[in-house]
Every structure is written in C-alpha cells, then in structure tokens.
C-alpha cells in the first residue's frame, strides 16, 4: 500500500540550497517508489524581500548579508555546484552574477498551483536562474518558464 506524504516545501527560487533539497527529496521518493507518493506544494519564502528591481551583485550581497569573504563565497559555490551535480542539477555559477527580487515569481507559482503545473514551473524557474543565469524577476523570463509548463501564458497576469 502506498502512503501519500503531503509536503509543504517552503523555498525561494533564488536559494541554491532549496533546489538541492528538492532534488534530494525527489531522489528519496524515487527510491521509495510504490511505498511513498509525494503530494508536494511549494510555499513562498522571499530570501530578499527588500531587494530592488535592479537586483544586486551576488558577491556584494553575500558579503553584506552573511559576512562572507570572496574566498568563502567561492568555496561555497564549489560545494553547491558539486552537490547539485551529484543530484543531477547543473549550477552554472559563471552565468549568475546577480541576485534578484522574486516576488513576481512567487505570484506566478501561486497561480501555477491552481492550474496544476506548480512543480514544473518551480523546476523551470530554478533552471532559468541557476543553470541559464536568467533574471527571475524579469517578466519575459517568467513567461518563458510558464511556456515550459504548457498552459497559455494569457491565463496568467502579473499586473
């Protein structure tokens, strides 16, 4: 008999540890296939709700918020990339130089849950930011991620 686990996954699309946690959770569920099924719901958490629309240089941000030196930041990026690779997710650290406000991405994820496409959109947003180096606050990026999930983008409004 399969047990269904309802999981509220609180995360931000600009958090590398969130995609690492999600991939690890998915792998664990795959290992327990037939025994456990996930009923996964993403809940919003903005890491940087006060972030301006222009974003901020990621090195500056990490130094200001966490006191990280450039050497510490580099070592952390290497650890994140290695952990992501082990879980089948590609971090392209050289493509990602800024951190952005993710409020509109969370708004779109809320809409996507109502349409039944939230997991695919969440994955597309993580990939857009961490693999492709795209700005998750840019509405064109959000529409491209939405198109990945197949519904008509005319159904979602970000105004």
Residue ranges of predicted features:
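Conserved redox-active cysteine motifs that mediate thiol-disulfide chemistry
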Residues: 13-23
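Conserved acidic, metal-coordinating active-site core of Asp-based
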Residues: 115-150
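Extreme N-terminus of proteins, especially the signal/transit-peptide cleavage junction
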Residues: 1-5, 33
């Amino acid at each position: 008999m399969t047990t269904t686990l309802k999981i509220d996954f609180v995360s931000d699309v600009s958090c590398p540890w969130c995609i690492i946690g999600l991939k690890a959770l998915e792998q664990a569920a795959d290992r327990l296939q037939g025994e456990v099924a996930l009923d996964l719901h993403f809940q919003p958490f903005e890491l940087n709700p006060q972030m301006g629309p222009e974003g901020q240089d990621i090195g500056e941000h990490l130094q200001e918020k966490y006191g990280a030196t450039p050497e510490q930041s580099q070592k952390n990026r290497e650890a994140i990339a290695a952990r992501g690779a082990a879980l089948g997710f590609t971090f392209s650290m050289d493509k990602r130089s800024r951190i952005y406000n993710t409020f509109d991405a969370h708004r779109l994820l809320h809409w996507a849950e109502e349409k039944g496409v939230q997991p695919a959109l969440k994955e597309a947003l993580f990939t857009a930011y961490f693999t492709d180096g795209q700005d998750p606050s840019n509405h064109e990026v959000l529409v491209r991620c939405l198109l990945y999930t197949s519904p008509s983008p005319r159904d979602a409004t970000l105004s």
